[in-house]
Amino acid sequence: MRKLKLQMQVSLDLFISSTESGMNWMIWPYGGEWTWDEELKKYFNDVTASNDTILLGWDMADGGYIDHWTNIALQKGNAQSAFAANVVAAHKHVFSRKKRKSRWDNTTTTTEDLATEVLRLKNLPGRDMIAYGGATFANALVRTGLIDEYHFIVNPAILGKGVSIFTKMDDMLTLAPSSARVYPCGVSVLIYHRR
């Protein structure tokens, strides 16, 4: 069975965005100059390349995620083009509450029950899957109990309040640590797996 990984940039207090300052607390807020050090970029690219399927919520996909990385993949010499090429090559599976037609290549949209569809995808042949998302989609995935690995890219900032992926939890979530690493740019990567 394929593994499902959730990768999120978070603050030290595990918020994914600030209610007041958006994402400017991140060392690299997914645009412009890629300010991570080379070792962290390699981790990021390697994790993405190890998957052949990306799960997204409709809001993130429609909000420009797929279009942005498709454009970056075409920019030869862009430091982010290796990551972008992996995004373009992977099959994107976009979840929506409403029936919608995909306007992107290599993408399927679905209104199927999230847990049922994720379990079906996990049982298909292929490499692992990775999910990126906004808070609503990530929280829904967490609540399915089907995430095998949590990859937290922890920025050295404490927000005090903000948007979390761990709201509306029905049960306590117990994880086991897999690895932890601090990178020269100040970001730590914490990887946990489901017990």
Language-model segment annotations:
Residues M1-R195:
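Enzymes that bind and transform nitrogen-containing heteroaromatic metabolites
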